[in-house]
Amino acid sequence: DVCSSDLRESIMQKVISTKRAPGAIGPYSQAIEINNMVFTSGVIPVNPATGEIAEGVEAQAEQAFENLCHLVEDSGSKVENIVKTTVFIKEMNDFGKINEIYKKYFKEPFPARSCVEVARLPKDVLLEVEAIAWK
């Protein structure tokens, strides 16, 4: 494998997987734990029980953040331990609406965050979120 190295093989990695968040739709893990840090993949607003995607950015934000919280919790960490999030949004005009939902899940001191407008997301959802947390 081109990316393999002695360093990578010497670091303990643990794959994190949960049914309380949407499964991977490609060759990647839902999250990886390494040295007591949890790195999630992007989480989209798919209801993991039904596969349905809610209408509207607020409902999608609720589902995406709920999925992210479940993934972090099922890693053995907790939402309060999230130190960085990245939010990918389809429409920057939705930034304020997403912030209102974000504040329901994250409290001060808020995690560091990047927000990026993108042309398109998987399944044509309106946002995707990823996080880094410590354990």
Regions found by a protein language model. Give the residues of each.
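Short, polar/acidic, helix-capping and beta-turn segments at strand->helix junctions
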Residues: 12-135
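Short, small-residue-biased leader/transition segments that mark boundaries at the very start
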Residues: 1-4
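Residue-level detector of intrinsically disordered terminal segments
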Residues: 7-11
